[in-house]
Amino acid sequence: MVFLRFASLGLLILSLSACGLLPEQEDETKDWSANQFYSRASAELADANYQQAIKYYEMLEARFPFGRYAMQAQLDVAYAYYKFDEPESAIAAADRFIKLNPTDPHVDYAYYLKGVVNFTRNIGFFDRFVPVDAAQRDPGAARQSFNDFAELVRRFPNSKYTPDAIQRMVFLRNNLAQSEVIAARYYMKRGALLAAANRAQYVVENYERTPAMKQALELLIEAYDGLGMEQLAQDTRRVLALNEEQGTFKDFETAKPRTLGRKVWDFIGLDRN
């Protein structure tokens, strides 16, 4: 028994000694320049190796916190996080870039990226294979995305990202309106007529000139009839008939406005000057 104990102790000592004899793994990046870090990170990003790209961008900023490479890495890592399906980290990185570089020529991209991240963040893994109507998803991220794009449009009306942001805002607004209609129908089926009327009224007041407007008015009429509010039901019927006569109920995308930009200015109430 004593022999076995000494033998075990000897083996332990030998193993520890062997560990000490093995050379430590050398850090290939120890002598890298900022340019080398950025080039490697960008190559990994281009090859869709997003986790590796994030690692090198963050190492670059840690070792070379000042200079143009570090500044660009702050922005690129936000995109890498977005592609790596880490929306919270992507938005945090974009916010950090905006805070540290408010006058940078590329800061408009940081605002745009925030909108894009929120635009897609509520599409989960399952939705990628079994698509779900966007209007049936939780509208929280859609509202935040709309606000992010609106901030971009307000601050940088001439940005190259603004036209795409405006198109996305139109899509988001239509789907936000439709989500309210879906909620109103849900309440209607459950017999909660007042709740249904409130949801439909919200669409009428906040989402004019969307495809959901006609449905909202029809739901309002049904709810008012059920509640015995005859005068309100009649008034809403007149509004519905008037809009149908004037051809108001056109899909926003197929209507012929003066300009797409002017449509969105009207919707979000921004300064048109």
Identify the function of each model-found stretch.
Residues A18-N273:
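Acidic, polar-rich low-complexity tracts and alpha-helical solenoid repeat scaffolds
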